[in-house]
C-alpha cells in the first residue's frame, strides 16, 4: 500500500527543517562573532574586550533562546580548547582562572535577558533593562569567582578592591556597548528573521 503525502505538508516540514538549519547557522555565526570580539583586547586585571558587546548583540538580534544558545556554544568552543577567549586563549584552565567567572557569567547574563524577553516582551526598554540586569549578574558572578580564586592563589583581598579592579573601570564602556547593541539590533533584527 502506498501513502501519498500532500504537497502542502511536505513543504511545511521542509520549511521547518530549513528554519532550524538557519537558526543553527545564526547561532554558530554569533558564537564566532563573540570570539572575534574577545580577540579585540586591552590587557588589564580583567582584560578589556568586546565580549559583553558580542553577548548583547547575540541576544538582541537572535532573541533570548537562540542568543543564549550562541553564548553557550561560544563557551563550549573555549572549553574544548579553541582559542576564542581574550588573548587567543582557550581551554578549561582559562575558565578556572581568576577571570573565568566573568566568561561563565556571560551565560547567566544571556539567561537573564531571555527570561526578561519571555515575561515582558521584546520592546526596546525591556531589552535595555534586561541587558543592564544581565550585566549586573555577570559582574556579581565574576567578582565572586575572582575573590575566591585570587584568595587561593595570591591571598585574600577586599570586595571594594576587587570591584575597583574588575568592575568599576568597565561600567561606562559596558553601558556604551549596550547602547551600540541596541542600535545594531534595530538595523539587523528585521533582516535576520529567526524569532
Annotated model-derived regions:
Residues 3-14, 29, 36, 92-140:
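Short helix-perturbing small/polar motifs within transmembrane alpha-helices
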Residues 38-50, 75-109:
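Interfacial aromatic-anchored transmembrane helix boundaries in multi-pass membrane proteins
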Residues 3-5, 78-84, 150-160:
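Peri-membrane helix termini and adjoining interfacial loops of integral membrane proteins
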Residues 2-70, 80:
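Hydrophobic transmembrane alpha-helices
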Residues 16-20, 44-45, 86-87, 92, ...:
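Helix-boundary and loop/linker segments of multi-pass membrane transporters
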Residues 24-29, 53, 57, 67-73, ...:
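Hydrophobic alpha-helical transmembrane segments
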Residues 33, 37, 41, 58, ...:
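Alpha-helical membrane-inserting segments
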Residues 122-195:
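Membrane-embedded alpha-helical hairpins and interfacial helices in multi-pass inner-membrane proteins
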Amino acid at each position: 500500500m502506498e501513502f501519498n503525502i500532500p504537497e502542502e505538508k511536505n513543504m511545511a516540514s521542509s520549511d521547518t527543517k530549513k528554519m532550524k538549519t538557519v537558526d543553527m547557522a545564526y547561532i554558530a555565526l554569533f558564537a564566532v562573532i563573540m570570539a572575534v570580539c574577545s580577540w579585540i583586547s586591552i590587557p588589564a586585571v580583567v582584560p578589556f574586550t568586546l565580549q559583553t558587546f558580542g553577548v548583547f548583540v547575540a541576544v538582541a538580534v537572535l532573541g533570548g533562546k537562540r542568543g543564549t544558545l550562541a553564548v553557550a556554544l561560544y563557551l563550549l568552543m573555549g572549553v574544548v580548547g579553541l582559542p576564542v577567549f581574550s588573548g587567543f586563549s582557550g581551554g578549561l584552565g582559562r575558565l578556572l582562572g581568576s577571570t573565568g567567572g566573568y566568561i561563565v557569567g556571560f551565560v547567566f547574563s544571556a539567561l537573564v535577558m531571555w527570561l526578561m524577553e519571555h515575561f515582558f516582551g521584546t520592546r526596546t526598554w525591556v531589552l535595555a533593562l534586561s541587558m543592564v540586569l544581565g550585566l549586573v549578574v555577570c559582574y556579581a558572578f565574576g567578582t565572586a569567582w575572582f575573590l575566591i580564586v585570587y584568595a587561593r592563589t595570591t591571598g585574600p583581598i577586599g570586595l571594594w578592591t576587587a570591584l575597583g579592579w574588575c568592575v568599576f573601570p568597565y561600567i561606562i564602556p559596558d553601558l556604551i556597548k549596550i547602547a551600540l547593541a541596541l542600535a545594531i539590533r534595530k538595523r539587523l533584527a528585521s533582516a535576520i528573521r529567526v524569532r
